[in-house]
Amino acid sequence: MIFHEFGDKKFPHILLIHGGGNSWWNYLRQARMLSDKYHVILPTLDGHGEEYQKEYISTENSAHQIMDYIKNNCNGKLFAVGGVSLGGQIAIELLSLNNDIAQKAIIDGSICIPQPRLARVSTIIVKLFGKLMFSKYACKIQLSLMKKMFPNMAYPKEIEDYYMEDMPRTPIKTLVTIYQTYMGEYRLKYSIAESKAQVLYIYGEKEMGCVKESAKLFQKMHPNCTVYEAKGYNHGYLSVYLPLEWMDLVNPFLENDVHHNS
C-alpha cells in the first residue's frame, strides 16, 4: 500500500480511501482543495494502481494496514476518515477497530450488509468479460461517452491519464476478491456503536437498495450519523465525479456540527 500526501503534516489529518478498481486519484481534486487547511492522505490499496502487483486480500486486511500507517505517521489519530464504495467500507472498519480513530467520517455509497447473490453474479461477469471491460479500448470509449453524455462529470485531462494507466492494469483477481469480500462477506460489526466519530453517510438516489439499507443499519447502530441522499445521482457520483458538490456538502460537516437533512 502506498500513501500520497497533500498539505502540511502539522495540519489535522484527513484520510480518504478510493473505490474498488480505481486508485488514489479518486480524491485527488478534493485533496488539493482541502490541503490549505488539512494534511490529506490518499492511499493506493493493494491490487490497484501502482500497487497492482500486490495481492488485494480484504476490507479487514486493508484497514489494518491503514491503521499501522496512522499509528506510525499521525500519532494514532485522524481528524477525519472517508471513502467511496469499497473505500467507505474500509473507513467503517477503521471506526469499528478503534472508537477514537477519527472525530469525523464521510462514507459514500458503501455497503455493510452481505450481498452473496450479487457478489456471485458480479464475480461471474468480471471473470467472463473483465479483460474486455477494462481494456484500454473500452476505457477510452467510457471516457469519451462520459464527455458526450455527462460533460459536467467528465474527468480533467490529468485524471483521464491516471485512469487510462491504472484501469487496464487492474488484475481481474483483484476485482473478484473485492466482489467476494466487500460485497459478499463484509458485515457491520457491533463495535461500531462504540465509535465516537460524527458520521456523514452519503448515497445516491439511484443507488441499489442494499446501499440504502446499509446506511439505515449504520445509523441505527451508530446514531451520531446523518444520512444524505444525493438527488438524481447514482453510485459514488459526488466522490468520484463531482468534487465541488462533494466539497459543498463535506466542508460544513468538517468545520461545524451542521447536520444535513436527507
Predicted regions and their residues:
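Gly/Ala-rich beta-loop-alpha elbow adjacent to hydrolase catalytic centers
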Residues: 83-87, 91
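Flexible "cap/lid" loop of the alpha/beta hydrolase fold
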Residues: 96, 102-133
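Conserved alpha/beta-hydrolase catalytic His-Asp/Glu region
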Residues: 116-118, 136-191
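Short beta-strand/loop motif that positions the catalytic acidic residue
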Residues: 195, 201-203
